[in-house]
């Protein structure tokens, strides 16, 4: 039985990759990689995201300057159609991921009751 759970997980992984929303996000990411300006903006977004996660892990908040930089980056992303398309595709895919997470972790939540 324990092997079955891994088989199910692998089937689920393949099913997620087969979703139109996943393929759309993947295509959008490839378009970003092909565009130098969009790629640089995406890399900047990832760096800022990592920095924010580091701050959160240490219980710190971004400074006012960092908040202003984040706001400026957000505006640049909103103005870039490739990035906007990618994040919209990611959002559509996250609906599935959130639902799957809720379903998979339901038994663990039951243990806490």
Swiss-Prot record:
Pfam families to which the protein is assigned, alphabetical: Com_YlbF
SUPFAM superfamilies in the cross-refs: YheA/YmcA-like
InterPro entries registered for this protein in UniProt: Com_YlbF, YheA/YmcA-like_dom_sf
Similarity annotation: Belongs to the UPF0342 family.
Protein name as catalogued: UPF0342 protein Sez_0866
Species, as recorded: Streptococcus equi subsp. zooepidemicus (strain MGCS10565)
Lineage: Bacteria, Bacillati, Bacillota, Bacilli, Lactobacillales
